[in-house]
A protein has these predicted regions:
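Class I (Rossmann-like) S-adenosyl-L-methionine-dependent methyltransferase catalytic domain
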Residues: 1-129, 146-220
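A conserved beta-strand element that flanks and buttresses the S-adenosyl-L-methionine
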Residues: 135
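Short catalytic micro-motifs in class I SAM-dependent methyltransferases
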Residues: 138-142
Length: 220
């Protein structure tokens, strides 16, 4: 896989805007709690054609692999989930407001459960939070802190009994907003998640230069 670092000169107005955003930014968890608490959504990737494209891929994968249960680390506002066809589902998120949104939205669905996720307080040696498929959609490139990134992936792969699917960019890209940090994440998984193999990479529906793809891992 070819790695490229995209660095472009920024216009003055955009440079100033990014500076202001960076000064206001504290950490990823607080950013997303503020986002949902003020009524904002999970973003354009969870709506419209992008959301539909992701759901087609995932629903096909779930059927093709006879997946009976899914756990998602980063369920957001639940709009992407509304397009999913999963037999049983557990959604985790760092934002209390996002969890409350999902609990209300899917209150009448007995096959879905939601829990607040805090990586610093999450220990699951008993395997209570596991599923056939562990899912991460548009999350990895929002993990701006190294420790948060590493803890998140450790928990994600521990939760997958058979499959892990990550939808993310996989390259270093500069000049981004402070809540975005594009990473070349696959080498970290190869080095730190033994017993897993990357068995497929499928191009995602995003046309952007910072294109996210589906990375499918299977337990060996």
């Amino acid at each position: 896989m070819i790695i490229r670092e995209v660095v472009r000169p920024l216009p003055g107005a955009r440079r100033l805007s990014l500076l202001r955003q960076r000064l206001a930014y504290s950490d990823s968890a607080r950013f997303w709690e503020r986002n949902y608490a003020r009524g904002a959504t999970s973003g354009s990737g969870s709506y419209g054609a992008l959301a539909e494209g992701k759901s087609r891929f995932l629903n096909t994968l779930v059927r093709g692999h006879a997946v009976r249960s899914v756990i998602e680390f980063g369920c957001g506002d639940g709009n992407q989930l509304s397009l999913a066809d999963y037999p049983r589902y557990v959604g985790l998120d760092v934002s209390r407001s996002a969890i409350a949104l999902c609990q209300r939205r899917f209150a009448d669905d007995p096959a879905k459960s939601f829990f607040l996720y805090d990586g610093t307080c999450f220990t699951d040696r008993a395997g209570m939070f596991t599923a056939d498929l562990a899912l991460s959609l548009d999350v990895v490139y929002h993990l701006t802190e190294d420790t948060v990134f590493e803890t998140y992936l450790t928990h994600l792969f521990a939760a997958g009994r058979r499959l892990v699917v990550i939808y993310s960019t996989n390259e270093e890209i500069s000049d981004t907003a402070p809540h975005v940090r594009h990473r070349h994440f696959t080498p970290w998984i190869e080095a730190n998640c033994p017993g897993w193999a990357l068995t497929g990479v499928t191009r995602g529906p995003s046309p952007d230069r910072a294109r996210a793809d589906f990375f499918v891992y299977e337990r060996q």
